[in-house]
């Protein structure tokens, strides 16, 4: 995938972010290939409101990769994946992780399949269904959700997918006190980690939830 249309600053921002996150720069090429596809398809399909490539690096790629250390192996379902976030950056940076991108919107699912095809991501599948309709109960070690719903909403539609010891990794902005308080009694918050996303201002938290 040709990323020659991207400015040197875009590459530099990504390399800097990978260094801060202690991730190998070998991922620069596939991540920029994904970014190039996202920019191209976004002109027609409006996959994301963010248009500036440098902002995309920070708010999409580096934000997704900030949770990479928590999901290096096993099977992961990315619920409401949208344009593939955080699922595709995680799959690129964790080749041993098997990722299912769950996205019911047809246009977004077509984009995801094209990314998988062009980047040759053998560890990624796309399920064009709503999370609650995915018939794969007790299959996944991890669920991710970046902008899908409240914690209660996420476990309601996708909790059945987790293995008994599996974890939901929900990406949030400010510390979600109210959402945590509203979790059903058979779910418990294992940890809340502040996320340091390179070049991003504003609060980010990763909430890890598991079944009791």
Swiss-Prot record:
GO terms for cellular component: cytosol. It is found in: Cytoplasm. It comes from the Bacteria. S-adenosyl-L-methionine binds at residues 80, 85, 131-132, 146. Pfam families: GidB. It catalyses: guanosine(527) in 16S rRNA + S-adenosyl-L-methionine = N(7)-methylguanosine(527) in 16S rRNA + S-adenosyl-L-homocysteine. InterPro entries: rRNA_ssu_MeTfrase_G (IPR003682), SAM-dependent_MTases_sf (IPR029063). Keywords: Cytoplasm, Methyltransferase, rRNA processing, S-adenosyl-L-methionine, Transferase. Its main location: cytoplasm. GO terms for molecular function: rRNA (guanine-N7-)-methyltransferase activity. Its EC number is 2.1.1.170. Belongs to the methyltransferase superfamily. RNA methyltransferase RsmG family. Specifically methylates the N7 position of guanine in position 527 of 16S rRNA. This is Ribosomal RNA small subunit methyltransferase G. The gene is rsmG.
